[in-house]
């Protein structure tokens, strides 16, 4: 005896009933989520306001302490120093707290993204975004090495040069946006290592608009060779800095949101000093580029405004990179000598 044919409509109705039950559960979960979200928003506002009040009172306290310190007796100086160190420590704790609270974007992010909130609320999301930023720098650095090598030795075309410079503009613009978001999420990036990306963006934009001609051809090979070397050094820095940061984070000596940078910082002193000759050579190459462009600008045949406007950013990059690196090295030598005297 044959079984009755399946009822397609009945199966659909049973599936619909199952979906209805699941949907009711989803609705309840979503309602609970909305309630918790409102509670979270209120907690964020309360915490932000409390931190703002505390920071204001700390600033007032630090100012009063600074004014009265010269008149303090010698036996009270140690207590004043201890209070100052506690105030600085408290300010650092507030910085870590604010990394998990919504905040207003700075001028640059407001111009680019508007008032959208870019604060990531979990450690996992922050670390994932930081890790993606590091991979982005690594992959683009390798691509820039390949393209600059191709333009330098295989292709002599203004079109490919323009594509290379356009990639540089896009790369540095993207870095500035991502770094601003990371700063909002607790990354401690030193001022110059952020600002020099804005200078590099401007420089790449001017190079992009430089028309082909005698002055361009005189500087072209030097610029492409410098770009190759700079990308190679950046690759070395990423490779060794990422390993050093991993070890220091495991020891609890570095923050989880610390980033690799295109320069030298105090935490790199142990194990990464071998990078200093590469860095200083690159800094002086930037100075050489600036002097070359200034000499070209004095040539009677030079008609392009881009020559001088490329020389100035190269000079600024040299001054910023060289003296920032030199200051870090000087501070480390000074601290080591001070420590040895204490011993």
UniProtKB/Swiss-Prot annotation:
Location relative to the cell: Cell membrane; Nucleus inner membrane; Endoplasmic reticulum
Topology in membrane: Multi-pass membrane protein
TM region(s), chain numbering: 133-152, 159-177, 191-209, 219-240, 271-294, 305-330
Domain of life of the organism encoding this protein: Eukaryota
GO cellular component: endoplasmic reticulum; membrane; nuclear inner membrane; plasma membrane
Functional note: Multifunctional protein involved in mechanosensation, and plays an essential role in lipid metabolism and adipocyte differentiation. May function as a potential ion channel involved in sensing mechanical stimuli. Mediates the mechanosensitivity of the PKD2-TMEM120A channel complex through direct physical interaction. TMEM120A seems to affect mechanosensation by inhibiting PIEZO2 channels, possibly by altering cellular lipid content.
Domain note: The transmembrane domain (TMD) has structural homology to the very long chain fatty acid elongase 7, ELOVL7, despite low sequence homology between them.
Name under which the protein is recorded: Transmembrane protein 120A
């Amino acid at each position: 005896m044959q079984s009755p044919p399946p009822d397609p409509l009945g199966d659909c109705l049973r599936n619909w009933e199952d979906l209805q039950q699941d949907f009711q559960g989803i609705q309840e979960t979503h309602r609970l989520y909305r309630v918790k979200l409102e509670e979270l928003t209120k907690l964020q506002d309360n915490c932000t306001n409390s931190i703002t009040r505390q920071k204001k009172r700390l600033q007032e306290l630090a100012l009063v302490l600074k004014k009265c310190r010269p008149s303090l007796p010698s036996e009270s100086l140690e207590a004043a120093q201890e209070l100052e160190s506690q105030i600085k420590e408290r300010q650092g704790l507030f910085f870590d707290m604010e990394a998990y609270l919504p905040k207003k974007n700075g001028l640059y992010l407001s111009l680019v993204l508007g008032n959208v909130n870019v604060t990531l609320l979990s450690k996992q999301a922050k670390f994932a975004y930081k890790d993606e930023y590091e991979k982005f720098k690594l992959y683009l650095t390798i691509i820039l090495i390949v393209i600059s090598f191709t333009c330098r030795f295989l292709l002599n075309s203004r079109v490919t040069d323009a594509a290379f410079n356009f990639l540089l503009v896009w790369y540095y613009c993207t870095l500035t946006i991502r770094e601003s978001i990371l700063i909002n999420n607790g990354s401690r990036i030193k001022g110059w290592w952020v600002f020099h990306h804005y200078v590099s963006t401007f420089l790449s934009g001017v190079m992009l608009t430089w028309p082909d001609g005698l002055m361009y051809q005189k500087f072209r090979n030097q610029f492409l060779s410098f770009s190759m070397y700079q990308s190679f050094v950046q690759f070395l820095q990423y490779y060794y800095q990422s390993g050093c940061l991993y070890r220091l984070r495991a020891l609890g000596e570095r923050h989880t949101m610390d980033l690799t940078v295109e320069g030298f910082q105090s935490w790199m002193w142990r194990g990464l000093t071998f990078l200093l000759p590469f860095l200083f050579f690159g800094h002086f190459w930037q100075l050489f580029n600036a002097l070359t462009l200034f000499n070209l600008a004095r040539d009677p045949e030079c008609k392009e405004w881009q020559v001088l406007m490329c020389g100035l950013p190269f000079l600024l990059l040299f001054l910023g990179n060289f003296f920032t690196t030199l200051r870090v090295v000087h501070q480390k030598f000074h601290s080591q000598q001070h420590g040895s005297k204490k011993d």
